[in-house]
Amino acid sequence: MGTSSLSSSGNLIWFITGTSQGFGFELVRAALQRGDSVVATSRTPEKVQKEFSAEADRLLAIPLDLRDPANIAAGVEKAVKRFGRIDVLVNNAGHGLLGAVEEASDSEIKNVFEINVFGLNRLTRAVLPYFRKQHSGHVVNLSSIGGLVGLPGWGIYNATKFAVEGLSEALAAEAAPLGIRVTVVEPGPFRTDFLGGSLTTAKEKIPDYEPTAGQTRQYAIDRNGAQQGDPVLAAEAIIQAITSENPPLHLILGALAYQRAAAKIESLQKDFETWREVALATDFKS
């Protein structure tokens, strides 16, 4: 069975995490404006419920704890009971950790992996049985350009998003014969709360890393609220992509993200070609 496109579907049922602000909030708005129905989850669902009270018949705002498998299962069950199915799962909830790799503590690392990777995977695993049963569905994982390119100060956050990239690519191959699609979204800097309340800075500061990770910390302070990316346009782009006839596996958003991804590909190609003979000489001789 091949993958099915949402382009010819009627009104969609969305299940979106992290909807109190940023990409999640704007996706709720854009989906409701399309006439779709939305299950909006966050730690403070009251905000979403109040903002979109006029669409209460097409909105279910519920709290969701991505650390709690039982809570996740109950949330998914509520969604299906209310709307009959789920068409699109958007794993948007996430958290940042800023600091050099050596500066980050075990507990800081575990906390960001818990939400960005384990929580995302828990929810995906809870929704997939419904997708398999209906032979359709689309998983949208919010990664980052930091899931393709590692930068000073973002090492641990990069690691979580690199994990999301690998998970998404593998799931796409596994689920395609079942009618399920996957898209991993890689935004650059957007004017959300990511550099504010959604970001934790490693407590330890090592002076030797001031010219690298330290400069990134200062960048986060200086650029917060002045990022060039518009989350409203990002939400529209995500919807356009996943409702197209051939949705992409990878969706890069923003000029800076596009430039960094292109530079990464060029750098990889250069390494591949430089070390081609060495690479090809390591197999057993047949």
Predicted regions and their residues:
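Conserved glycine-rich cofactor-binding loop
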Residues: S20-G22
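Residue(s) in the substrate-gating loop at a strand-loop-helix junction
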Residues: S144
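SDR active-site lid
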Residues: P177-P247
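Substrate-binding pocket helix/loop in short-chain dehydrogenase/reductase
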Residues: A100-V101, E108-K110
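The beta1-alpha1 cofactor-binding region of Rossmann-like NAD(H)/NADP(H)-dependent oxidoreductases
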Residues: L64-A74, D106-S107
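Active-site helix of classical SDR
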Residues: T124, T160
